[in-house]
Amino acid sequence: MSWQEKIDAALDARRVADALRRRYPVAQGAGRWLVADDCQYLNFSSNDYLGLSHHPQIIRAWQQGAEQFGVGSGGSGHVSGYSVAHQALEEELAEWLGYSRALLFISGFAANQAVIAAMMAKEDRIVADRLSHASLLEAASLSPSPLRRFAHNDVTHLARLLASPCPGQQLVVTEGVFSMDGDSAPLEEIQQVTQQHDGWLMVDDAHGTGVIGEQGRGSCWLQKVKPELLVVTFGKGFGVSGAAVLCSDTVADYLLQFARHLIYSTSMPPAQAQALRASLGVIRSDEGDTRREKLAALITRFRAGVQDLPFTLADLCSAIQPLIVGDNSRALQLAEKLRQQGCWVTAIRPPTVPAGTARLRLTLTAAHEMQDIDRLLEVLHGNG
């Protein structure tokens, strides 16, 4: 098979399965409204959970940062790209989340890949939740360490896997709030089992940080656990982009020596770090509390109105509210019908989610109003 034949076969297989991904160029994709092809839609696909991507204070912080530092960092943090803005953000994140250190990365994907690649050796073992994010599972599969997956949120299964002999160290990997299902991991139980087997715990809290817990400190704070490795990302609750790894002093020093994604990548622009500092300030403030309270009220309103629809609806209260449809084609058709009626909703299909669980992944944000939720419910009832 030639290169072209290989590529054509892979694309054809996705088309036949109604699983071919497509991008849509938008004029505005975050916040309450999505604008595409000169049309305006209520946006129920954004991860901008607190509606901070258009916050004037954060925008101005980025502008002032660009005026002060320029538009790029100029290099890796190990060369010339680690600015006082980066240092200040790391210190503020560490203080906020109760860790000794924080290290910045250009994305959550890069952070997860870097940590697992740097920490794991062939004699070690990775034990990951089966529904962990693609960045975690890909990093684990590329690692020299064996990967074992435990059934989703099944602590008993996790304990059995950890109990089997391992010549090296064991790293348990999970998420705080799962990106496609919107449910939370039982972190306290997972940490207890992990500690019983002398393992370390790594939690990716991309969808919890900023959104839940006191001052938006996320899933681990809410469940009163402190994993050895906590990954937080800035493209969701913070409304910006990038990520950080929270850890001890010695682990941070280790990652600075061995995390290749950190060493050999240009660091995020200092102006972005300034915007993130402003975003963190909002998240920790009374305004942040108000936005989280509003989001919770919107979620309650949505769940009360969707109970009688013929979709599988999980019992969860996160900003991610998936409606399980099952069939790929039907999920695509429903998403298109909703768009035709002014609601931008994304159909998520395998391989992103397990076969037979195609869904409408609805996300609610603090930028929405109650009438937006009522309109979404009206459209869903008309197409259920």
Swiss-Prot record:
<dbReference type="InterPro" id="IPR050087">
    <property type="entry name" value="AON_synthase_class-II"/>
</dbReference>
<dbReference type="GO" id="GO:0030170">
    <property type="term" value="F:pyridoxal phosphate binding"/>
</dbReference>
<dbReference type="GO" id="GO:0008710">
    <property type="term" value="F:8-amino-7-oxononanoate synthase activity"/>
</dbReference>
<keyword id="KW-0663">Pyridoxal phosphate</keyword>
<feature type="binding site">
    <location>
        <position position="179"/>
    </location>
    <ligand>
        <name>pyridoxal 5'-phosphate</name>
    </ligand>
</feature>
<protein>
    <recommendedName>
        <fullName>8-amino-7-oxononanoate synthase</fullName>
        <ecNumber>2.3.1.47</ecNumber>
    </recommendedName>
</protein>
<dbReference type="InterPro" id="IPR015422">
    <property type="entry name" value="PyrdxlP-dep_Trfase_small"/>
</dbReference>
<feature type="modified residue" description="N6-(pyridoxal phosphate)lysine">
    <location>
        <position position="236"/>
    </location>
</feature>
<feature type="binding site">
    <location>
        <begin position="108"/>
        <end position="109"/>
    </location>
    <ligand>
        <name>pyridoxal 5'-phosphate</name>
    </ligand>
</feature>
<feature type="binding site">
    <location>
        <position position="233"/>
    </location>
    <ligand>
        <name>pyridoxal 5'-phosphate</name>
    </ligand>
</feature>
<keyword id="KW-0093">Biotin biosynthesis</keyword>
<dbReference type="Pfam" id="PF00155">
    <property type="entry name" value="Aminotran_1_2"/>
</dbReference>
<dbReference type="InterPro" id="IPR001917">
    <property type="entry name" value="Aminotrans_II_pyridoxalP_BS"/>
</dbReference>
<comment type="pathway">
    <text>Cofactor biosynthesis; biotin biosynthesis.</text>
</comment>
<dbReference type="InterPro" id="IPR004839">
    <property type="entry name" value="Aminotransferase_I/II_large"/>
</dbReference>
<dbReference type="InterPro" id="IPR015421">
    <property type="entry name" value="PyrdxlP-dep_Trfase_major"/>
</dbReference>
<dbReference type="InterPro" id="IPR004723">
    <property type="entry name" value="AONS_Archaea/Proteobacteria"/>
</dbReference>
<feature type="binding site">
    <location>
        <position position="207"/>
    </location>
    <ligand>
        <name>pyridoxal 5'-phosphate</name>
    </ligand>
</feature>
<dbReference type="InterPro" id="IPR022834">
    <property type="entry name" value="AONS_Proteobacteria"/>
</dbReference>
<feature type="binding site">
    <location>
        <position position="352"/>
    </location>
    <ligand>
        <name>substrate</name>
    </ligand>
</feature>
<comment type="subunit">
    <text>Homodimer.</text>
</comment>
<dbReference type="GO" id="GO:0009102">
    <property type="term" value="P:biotin biosynthetic process"/>
</dbReference>
<feature type="binding site">
    <location>
        <position position="21"/>
    </location>
    <ligand>
        <name>substrate</name>
    </ligand>
</feature>
<comment type="similarity">
    <text>Belongs to the class-II pyridoxal-phosphate-dependent aminotransferase family. BioF subfamily.</text>
</comment>
<feature type="binding site">
    <location>
        <position position="133"/>
    </location>
    <ligand>
        <name>substrate</name>
    </ligand>
</feature>
<comment type="function">
    <text>Catalyzes the decarboxylative condensation of pimeloyl-[acyl-carrier protein] and L-alanine to produce 8-amino-7-oxononanoate (AON), [acyl-carrier protein], and carbon dioxide.</text>
</comment>
<dbReference type="InterPro" id="IPR015424">
    <property type="entry name" value="PyrdxlP-dep_Trfase"/>
</dbReference>
<keyword id="KW-0808">Transferase</keyword>
